[in-house]
Amino acid sequence: MKIYVTSIMVDSQEKACQFYTEKLCFKVKHDVPVGDYRWLTLVSPESPEGVELLLEPDAHPAAQPFKAAMKADLIPYTSFQVEDLDAEYERLKNLGVRFTSEPMRAGKVKVAVFDDTCGNLIQLMQVLSLIHI
């Protein structure tokens, strides 16, 4: 068994697709109309056959309060791994991405959190090698 698709609830599939492809450089894998919405998945260009990220409309009545509570408590909805957090932080800041926390060490990882403009906080994480520790 393996994870095939994971989802993130977004307030606008179009806006989310634009942010995640233009800022994070993810690629559209599937874009299939389904009623009022789309089955819209993205993949990392580093792993095009890997786990797909579904941009799930947050239309369910429970979604908005859940997302608002997570954001109010500064809890990231999900986490993406990067090789060089400091470089990615600077690249994204230069593209206008708003970070809610700057890069910081947390044990054997370094993390930073940004706002995806679609109602979520997203954590970037770099696993530190023995050289960094």
Where are the model-predicted features located?
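Short, charge-rich, low-complexity interaction segments located
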Residues: 50-53, 57, 64
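Conserved small/polar residues in nucleotide/adenosyl-binding loops
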Residues: 131-133
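Active-site beta-strand termini and strand-to-loop segments that position acidic
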Residues: 43-47, 114-117, 127
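Core segments of cupin and vicinal oxygen chelate
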Residues: 8-51
